[in-house]
């Protein structure tokens, strides 16, 4: 089971927090659709901003979006213009959705940007960087070896696995290649495993990238 499901999903409530922190009875399906729209807008607008995570918190009238990134200045922009532009796109999309669903409720939207200080511990940032390098036509094996070498220098990471799939280096037949170091106990629920995935758009088609980082085991603190 550990190899068939995303590592962060199977560990929700154990050692991984929920990415959306809210609960409503009647409006859940509408708010879930809004959350998907918010994430889509962020991922499209900030593709190269080194985003580690996007968390969403809600009350009945307020929406708070927390973006963790290693390039906060790129998101905020000069005099806050970047973050205001991002907020305007989200507001426009949410209002269109609510109009379509006939929901007439006022709301406020707040965006907080948190700086990610250590990019080498973020699977999402690493997968985005691999995708960027592959799009720049750097050979995938060179990218993977360099990434594994950089990860191996970090003592906090006990194991790592990289996987790329698609028409690698323009090959006629798509294939999957992987590279790993250390341990990767996917079936151990107390294992702290960070997972990230990205897609590189090349002239030969899409190349999928997956990254697993094992950071040791998490035990409950004794009172």
Placement of each model-derived feature along the sequence:
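RNA-contacting regions in translation and RNA-metabolism proteins
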Residues: 1-223
């Amino acid at each position: 089971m550990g190899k068939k499901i995303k590592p962060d999903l199977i560990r929700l409530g154990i050692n991984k927090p929920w990415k959306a922190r809210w609960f409503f009875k009647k409006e859940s399906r509408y708010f879930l659709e809004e959350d998907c729209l918010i994430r889509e807008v962020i991922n499209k607008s900030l593709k190269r901003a080194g985003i580690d995570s996007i968390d969403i918190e809600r009350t009945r009238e307020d929406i708070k979006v927390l973006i963790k990134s290693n390039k906060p200045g790129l998101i905020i922009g000069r005099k806050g213009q970047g973050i205001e532009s991002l907020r305007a796109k989200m507001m426009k999309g949410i209002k269109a959705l609510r109009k379509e669903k006939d929901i007439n409720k006022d709301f406020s939207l707040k965006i907080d940007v948190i700086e990610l200080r250590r990019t080498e511990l973020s699977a999402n940032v690493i997968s985005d960087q691999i995708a960027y390098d592959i799009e720049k036509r750097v050979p995938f094996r060179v990218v993977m070896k360099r990434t594994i070498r950089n990860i191996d220098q970090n003592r906090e990471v006990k194991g790592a696995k990289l996987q790329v799939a698609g028409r690698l280096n323009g090959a006629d037949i798509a294939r999957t290649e992987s590279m790993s170091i250390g341990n990767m106990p996917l079936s151990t629920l107390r294992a702290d495993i960070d997972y990230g995935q990205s897609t590189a758009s090349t002239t030969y088609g899409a190349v999928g990238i997956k990254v697993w980082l094992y950071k040791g085991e998490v035990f409950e603190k004794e009172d």
